[in-house]
Every structure is written in structure tokens, then in C-alpha cells.
Amino acid sequence: MLNITTFLDANACRLDKNVLYNPKTNEKYNSHEILAMTSEIARDLKNCGIKKGDRILIYLNNSTKYLFSLFAIWRLGAIAIPTNRVFTPHELEYIIDDSQAKLMITDEDAKDIVDLDKYIPKNIENYKNGEILPAEPTDWDDLCQLQYTSGTTGQPKGAMLTHGNYFTAIHNECDVLTMKQDDVYMGIYPM
């Protein structure tokens, strides 16, 4: 069944041109490189005991590692909990407790911010041509992300997003924008 992870697989097999560009760092990646580096992070997470259905908090600066970590979590059938780097320890602790996060993906600068098992992504640039980790099968109704609200009327709430939600949103955006294979899209939202 087509979902976010298999969508990435399908594109990695047919596109060898750069599909991701970070102007801040001048990083450029094609779909196969993204899939290989995503697989390396997923392999590391699997070695940390992460499995389908586990909830993983991401606490990184805006970066390609953030995006690849998100894809890696989905590749394992786990559930991503994206957070913003401006969150305080108190805000993170609330989300960790509420979401029942099992692990936090972060970096050296933030490794001591809260008491939760951590994974710090290594230099994944070395894995651009690495071995692809097969994706865990997921259905459209499987949860892939807990997106916490701003909490303007109380405590933040974890909105449950499924693989089907994401895939449908991507499909609809491509239809509305009439995007074609050679089009360029600029993502401006912070992670």
C-alpha cells in the first residue's frame, strides 16, 4: 500500500536529480541519498530498540537531520513527535509525559535538557550511498505523528496524524498547485 515511506522509496528508484536543497548550508540531495541517509538513522533507532508504534520526540534545530529523522521514524512505523528548539525544559517534559515518548532525537547541545533516553545522529553524509533499510509496513490509518498544538486555550494537545493524512495532503497540494516532476517547490515553514 502506498504511504509516506513507500512514496519515498518509489521516488528514490526513479529520480537521480537533486530534490532537496538547503540554501543555508548549500546541502543538495537526490532521492536515493535521502533514502540512504534516512535508512542509516532508522537502523540506529532500531538498534536503540525502537519498533513500530513507539513514540519518538525530535528536538533538533531546523536542518536536514530533522527531516531525515522524521522520515526514519516513519520508516520504522514509529510515531514522530516534532518539537521546536525554543521549547523550555518544562514544555518538553509536558510533551514527553503526555505523549509517552520513548526516545528523544537531539544533538550534543541539548543532550542534558530533559531526562529521557537520547539518540544523537552521527555524520550521516557518509551514508549517501548506504544500504536501504526496508520499511515497516504501515496502513493509511496508522498513526505517524503527534503534532502538538500551541495550547492557547490550555495545555497543548497532541493532534494525531496518520500516514493517510500526510499522503492525502501531499497529493492534494500537488493537484492544487498543478505540480509536475520538474517543478521547484520552496518550503518556508520551520520544522
Label the model's feature ranges:
Residues 1-19, 36:
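A short N-terminal helical cap/helix-turn-helix that marks the beginning
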Residues 9, 46, 64-83, 93, ...:
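Hydrophobic alpha-helical segments in the ANL/AMP-binding
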Residues 15-16, 131-148, 155, 178-184:
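Conserved pre-ATP/AMP-binding loop-to-beta segment of ANL
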Residues 19-49, 54-63, 67, 71, ...:
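Conserved AMP-binding/adenylate-forming core of the ANL superfamily
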Residues 30-32, 144-171:
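Conserved AMP-binding A3 loop
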Residues 55, 61-81, 85-89, 98-103, ...:
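A short helix-loop-beta submotif of the ANL/AMP-binding
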Residues 85-113, 130, 169-186:
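Conserved ATP-dependent adenylate/AMP-binding module captured primarily in the ANL superfamily
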Residues 109-141, 155:
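ANL superfamily adenylate-forming
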